[in-house]
Curated annotation (Swiss-Prot):
It comes from Tetrahymena thermophila (strain SB210). Substrate binds at residues 9-15, 24, 41, 88, 113-115. Gene3D superfamilies: 3.40.50.450. Its EC number is 3.2.2.-. Catalyzes the cleavage of the N-glycosidic bond of deoxyribonucleoside 5'-monophosphates to yield deoxyribose 5-phosphate and a purine or pyrimidine base. Belongs to the 2'-deoxynucleoside 5'-phosphate N-hydrolase 1 family. It catalyses: a pyrimidine 2'-deoxyribonucleoside 5'-phosphate + H2O = a pyrimidine nucleobase + 2-deoxy-D-ribose 5-phosphate; a purine 2'-deoxyribonucleoside 5'-phosphate + H2O = a purine nucleobase + 2-deoxy-D-ribose 5-phosphate. It is an enzyme of class 3 (hydrolase). GO terms for molecular function: 5-hydroxymethyl-dUMP N-hydrolase activity. It is found in: Cytoplasm; Nucleus. GO terms for biological process: deoxyribonucleoside monophosphate catabolic process; nucleoside metabolic process; nucleotide metabolic process. One of its GO terms (cellular component) is cytoplasm. This is Putative 2'-deoxynucleoside 5'-phosphate N-hydrolase 1. Keywords: Cytoplasm, Glycosidase, Hydrolase, Nucleotide metabolism, Nucleus.
Length: 145
């Protein structure tokens, strides 16, 4: 990727009970160093609730798909199972030359789907702590240059 500021689509479980918003916030903060994160609200439940309070499901879909089409890369936190994240990863898998990083905690309740961890167009990485998140994102972004 060139020196032009990246547009980044971040996704993670929002309605699920296992969302780790502290890790999401670390991810969004790190991604913000490399470009514009179109979906920062995912990391902040109070912001998300405020944004989506008056939106119906179709409006949420249309908004998110629009952000996806504007983005140049995707970073997905896939530790907690999520239908929405699966949908977003489906979009990413069908888009040519679209770089996608999937992050998952090493110690977790659920095993990541082989359709995500084994997808040849995704970079799948596991982390143990926030320092790992920072290092993985830095390496991913370095590869884009």
């Amino acid at each position: 990727m060139s020196q032009k500021k990246l547009t980044i689509y971040f996704c993670g479980s929002m309605r699920g009970v296992n969302a780790n918003h502290q890790n999401y916030q670390t991810i969004v903060q790190e991604l913000s160093k490399y470009g514009e994160v179109l979906t920062t609200h995912v990391a902040y439940p109070e912001m998300s609730n405020k944004l989506e309070h008056k939106m119906n499901d179709k409006q949420i879909y249309e908004r998110d798909y629009s952000w996806f089409t504007e983005s140049q890369v995707m970073v997905a936190e896939v530790t907690a199972p999520s239908h929405g994240v699966g949908m977003e990863l489906g979009w990413a898998s069908l888009r040519q030359n679209y770089k996608t990083l999937c992050l998952s905690q090493k110690e977790k309740e659920f095993k990541t789907s082989g359709l995500i961890a084994g997808c040849p167009t995704f970079e799948y990485k596991e982390y143990q702590n926030q320092e790992d998140i920072v290092a993985i994102i830095a390496e991913f972004m370095k590869q884009l240059q």
